[in-house]
Amino acid sequence: MSQKDIEMELKELRNKLNRWSNEYYVLDTPSVEDSVYDKHYQRLLELEQANPDLVTADSPSQRVGGKVLSGFTKVSHDIPMLSLGDVFSKEELIEFLERLENSVEQKLDYSCELKIDGLAISLTYENGKFIKGSTRGNGVIGEDITENLKTIKAIPMELNEPVSIEVRGECYMPKKSFVELNTKREAEGQAVFANPRNAAAGSLRQLDTKITASRNLSTFIYYLMEPEKLGIKTQTEALNKLESWGFKVNNESKQVKTKEEIFAYIDKATDQRANLPYDIDGIVLKAESFAVQSQVGNTVKVPRWAIAYKFPPDEQETKVLDIEWTVGRTGVVTPTAVMEPVTLAGTTVARASLHNPDYLKEKDIRIGDTVKLHKAGDIIPEISEVVLAKRTEDSVEYQIPTECPECGAKLVHLDDEVALRCINPQCPALVKESLTHFASRNAMDIRGLGPRIIEQLYNREMIKDVAGIYSLTFEQLITLDKFKEKSANNLLTAIDNSRNNSIERLIFGLGIRHVGAKVARILAENYKSMDNLAKAKSDEISTIDSLGKIIGDSVEMYFADEHVMELLDELRQAGVNLEFLGKTREEQLESSTDSSFNGLRVVLTGTLDTLKRSEAKSWLEAHGAKVTGSVSKKTDLLIAGHDAGSKLTKAQELNVRVMNEAEFIQQMEEES
């Protein structure tokens, strides 16, 4: 490649990765799988390592990932808690060893340690007494979790010597404790944790320390900061000293001299992994000498003297029984592989998304094929490859459908998309998905009007579009399966309440392409009414901050449809509000800067007893919070009512602060 080509590829990679990172962490709308991001990130690292003079300040490689969540006091790390570089093969590991030894021009001894799958922590002691504990956070700023760490029996409150030190380690939940916790939660009707790491992370960030104490967490301490001040020269010596002071250290650590010893350690760890009482996801290799560690130093993101060898993902073989196609709300037709059930990473898996026709063609997946299945990110089932050696001779290439599986209309590609779409507005699947979206919690929030009820209403020709929801009668609803008087009355009340929503919910509920809840709010703030928005032109919309031409074109095209205008008239006649009722962001900021909720991203979930969900949302927004409908890594606070369900589970898995209704009401009263 020429220098110009390298510069162009680097620029493109940086732009893509920064955009994807923004979609994931800021907008809550990731557009690519983690595996796609990782592939591009690895390519970026390759090019930058070969061309260090082309590394820019805005490169993703110069950032330490992570986010400090609200709810705990922020703590600055005097010495950054850096992440480790990863390798995934012995060949890559050899390259690391050679690079490190060449940099110091000598053969080195190494410390091999198990990579505990938990949460990184830092502990500080003064004169032998524990005074502070914190999370890694973003590597530079973490959170003070001292009180919760005090509940963990493996952490000594006072050391065997009166030393003033900082140590780092991993907090984890033993496998046995994880099984016991999930068994108890399941028996109590609570959501279970996905894995021990998520359980440990969620337990460590509980506001109630009694809950943390009940979770039987443990720790391994693996590093002593500034060891030279104590005359300690090697990692093995430091581990021995840590143990003598009273810390729990992992006794599987081993000092080695050759790559053969390193590989033997990896092989042993791989064989013993399933039988260990705690989860590991690899091994960590460190230069044994602290003098060498100091000599080679760190990059912005990772130490040059250590590396993590990551185990390959758990993988199983299974057989593809069928390929099903489903139609989504926007008409996208998505293939899914139906497979013989297998156990993968502790759960039974029988289905895996095939994403789009291009993915299906690229993998050449056929009905009857034996495939290798793994969980991307240990969460999402994904077919990694077809086992061609087991493909039968009569196997035929799978034919991508040309007609919608629901209505038979011709499928099309729009704007060079890889996705196939059904664009028939009368497609039953599309209509039902649109109705479900319109009634969903983030849109018009019509409780009780879920997919099962919509299926019946549509099939019985009681509704054909969203306006039809507002014509439903008690006599119609009472005829539905398992629908009694109370259910019918509750649904009619929910429908009636939705008439009074501000238009940002309606805009989002209509399902305009490229218009999510955030964009809907921006449009509502700027245009104030549906009538104004319907007249807006793309060029005008495109000038609004954070929107642009794609959204502008989509909105203008949507309202250019005469059927849409007829629908708006029907909604108006049904008494649905078509005006913006909330405060603009500027008005909110003027009145909310002193609120503890100001600037927080908040999610409401479960049933609230004291006030309506819409009232809670309005109050939060008036006090500077941004209320979103889904939990992500960017969520600051989850307010949980009764029967909180999956959002509470996800919040605990992501270490998001959780507040119950009583705590929320108390805070409201203090700030009102």
UniProtKB/Swiss-Prot annotation:
Residues of the active site: K115
Alphabetical UniProt keywords: DNA damage, DNA repair, DNA replication, Ligase, Magnesium, Manganese, Metal-binding, NAD, Zinc
Keyword Magnesium assigned: yes
Residues annotated as signal peptide: none
Listed Pfam families: BRCT, DNA_ligase_aden, DNA_ligase_OB, DNA_ligase_ZBD, HHH_2
Catalytic activity from the UniProt record: NAD(+) + (deoxyribonucleotide)n-3'-hydroxyl + 5'-phospho-(deoxyribonucleotide)m = (deoxyribonucleotide)n+m + AMP + beta-nicotinamide D-nucleotide
Broadest EC class assigned to this enzyme: ligase
Cofactor(s) the record lists: Mg(2+); Mn(2+)
One annotated GO biological process: DNA repair
Residues that coordinate or bind NAD(+): D34, S35, V36, Y37, D38, S83, L84, E113, R136, E170, K286, K310
InterPro entries (alphabetical): BRCT_dom, BRCT_dom_sf, DisA/LigA_HHH, DNA_ligase, DNA_ligase_AS, DNA_ligase_CS, DNAligase_adenylation, DNAligase_N
One GO CC annotation: cytosol
Function of the protein: DNA ligase that catalyzes the formation of phosphodiester linkages between 5'-phosphoryl and 3'-hydroxyl groups in double-stranded DNA using NAD as a coenzyme and as the energy source for the reaction. It is essential for DNA replication and repair of damaged DNA.
PANTHER family documented for this protein: CHROMOSOME TRANSMISSION FIDELITY FACTOR 18 (PTHR23389), DNA LIGASE (PTHR23389:SF9)
Family to which this protein belongs: Belongs to the NAD-dependent DNA ligase family. LigA subfamily.
Protein name (database record): DNA ligase
Gene (UniProt): ligA
